[in-house]
Amino acid sequence: KRQVEMVVKSSAISDDNPELVSAKEQLIPVLARAEMLSSLMNNKRGIAIAGTHGKTTTTSLVASIMTSANLDPTFINGGIINSFNSNAQLGEGDYLIVEADESDKSFLLLQPSVSIVTNIEPDHLVNYDGSFDNLKKAFLEFIKKLPFNGVSIVCGDDTVVKELKINFQRPHISYGFESSNDYVLSSYRTDGRNSYFKLTSDTDSFDFKLNMLGKHNVLNAAAAIVLCLQEGIAVKVIQDSLSNFMGIDRRMQILGEKKIGSSTCLYIDDYGHHPTEINKTIQAIRTSFPDFELKMVFQPHRFTRTKDLYEEFIEVLSHVDELFLLDIYSAGENPIEGINSPNIQSSLIRSGFDNVKLLNSNEVAKEYDKDLAKDTIFVFQGAGDISSISQSIFEEFK
């Protein structure tokens, strides 16, 4: 029987975790996830993908394209890539692709050869002394971790990226819908299940089909495309990989559909838990399914995030047709006075949106046993245990 030689932990694991306690009692070395990734990068061409939103999807797309190109990469991701049925793979190729986590500053331990920054917004500020400026400085430091011949691929549409670019001190390539970018997106359209777009540089222009919904995912795809083009992967390989991409667990994942009376009911599960992410999900659904009613079951995630972005949550949650609010998922945090779902409901009603109900997890299923006036999408939104609720409900009613 092989003995444990080392334990690797993420910042989500508390010090009183029984496996961690046991490791320390047995004097087994304990290493932070980012420290291990940094060590692994010493022997690979490291690609680190960071940003407030979209890094899991972008990491998944890069890993899928490089696998399609027979590069056999090692990847470590924040979500399950459906085609691999895993969030990680140990490959024998030269590449190590990692989702870089800014939430606890651990991305600053990485020293990649290439980096991607998808966007920068206020989040996890509790780990930055409550200062957005400190978070911005951390992203600048992340980019400066690149070697002198490294390159950062950045979303040039992002307001904060634009602000910081002058201080990058490393070569960078920008992408986005705005014409000032090095790679410009255009001709975006959707057919309800796929996205179509063109990506143009000074020298080339290519058409792509992406098996995902939403302009935000087109931006994620653009980051992956630019990186893979820079690494010498053929355009046809990239096009085929994006067209056949099977998605990521809980990233606008269509669980399925069923008939309720004469109406179609479509079920979508989504991990987004920041107001910007929720807004992008709503926009993507409205664009792709304009004739459907949109009902959302939302589980707020963390008391600190809900407090810091309270007004933004009130604004974005009012854009659905009907909202079902679950209790806040603490993620190990202590409650904050006045920050709770009943107060969110009250604030929404005061803002003029009154089609909002408070539910516990056992009551959610009752909302699916009702006749529908029209075709409807139920989206389960949040980063807590709402996924287990959505899966059990869909299995029960499909």
Can you say where each PLM-predicted feature lies in the sequence?
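Nucleotide phosphate-binding/pyrophosphate-handling subdomain across enzymes
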Residues: 114, 192-193, 202-322
